[in-house]
């Protein structure tokens, strides 16, 4: 079983910087402003030959249990309960504060092994803070600089001393684990031959996106059946894109909770800009994006812009009408919402839209059934023979128009990629092909090969002119 380490401390001592250093990627948002991290985030990490899972946590603050800070503290306590070892981080440059003393007592009560980490020790002013740290009663401080990567060898040794060599290296006895940077943004080229088999062993990456306060984190907590993510009435609670592993009916899922996306004109703070960039990366890394609409006020301009972004990125869009428990005339409302989906988002015909209540856990199975169905379609490959049989029929039924007195000729079609399905048509004079005829072909592909509800790409290529080379030879 993998060693799990939680990074704990008051706000702005460098916990997220240390987390990013250990995982080898800039996953957690980092800013000079205190309280950037709100939810706990877990990821595979490596420190030289030592491998483990590390949890980044919200800064511990003294506040009532029902306040935002109090709920953040509950998330940190849950991380402490999950962990085998705690890295208690303090700011050596600033020295020990009353909050450090208070929270050191809380961490000691957990009974877990603790390594006291003196961060920002590259500063000349840090020596005094390291001496003060003995007052915490957590043993000898380990001086490091997470920002500059200093002292990490000593941190490795301190972790091994705290848990013992056998526990520290238990993961190495299992199959080697490689940590790779997340690939972001690019469509996945599929160069395999036809007849690609759908691989159910791979986890599906699902991002939960939407404007602020539509219930994204509440929905994920209902899926997991635990208070894994911070929720509340305040808009904009989520800042990082948090990934959580889940299993639904035997299928492995990786869920990404994202920060709410507002209109550009309202995004002013540097921290919110970082959150938005993190959300956009999560959308591009995902395969399926659940766009959460507030059913009591759906189809706001920002809802449609987020849906359009997901479609342009080529991901599988699925709309979740959340807060359905607040809707009175549910049947008539659902008919109206489906009609609006078709009217406001015509670029993806047959878009899946599911009513649900994240608060009460209603409609989640229906949502997941639609996700699984659309994910299969998104991965679909169609044989070239079937495509050209279809093309012959549709062109005979409705040939392309004549341009400047010359009829356009559509000759050949093949599928060049999946995820999303992409097709290339060989034709004469592709630059003058009307967009209306391209839409006719795309809609025909959707209908014939059952590809409704996902983006479909269609590109044109000029067919070879056999007389062009002869003319050049003359």
Swiss-Prot record:
Similarity comment text for this entry:
Belongs to the TRAFAC class TrmE-Era-EngA-EngB-Septin-like GTPase superfamily. EngA (Der) GTPase family.
Q: Name one GO biological process term.
A: ribosome biogenesis
Protein's name in the database: GTPase Der
- Organism of origin is Bartonella tribocorum (strain CIP 105476 / IBS 506)
Which Gene3D superfamilies has this protein been placed in?
3.30.300.20, P-loop containing nucleotide triphosphate hydrolases (3.40.50.300)
Which key words tag this protein in UniProt?
Answer: GTP-binding, Nucleotide-binding, Repeat, Ribosome biogenesis
**EngA-type G domain sequence ranges:** 3-167, 204-379
Indicate the segments forming the KH-like domain, all copies.
Answer: 380-464
Provide the residue positions that the database annotates as binding GTP 2: 210-217, 257-261, 322-325
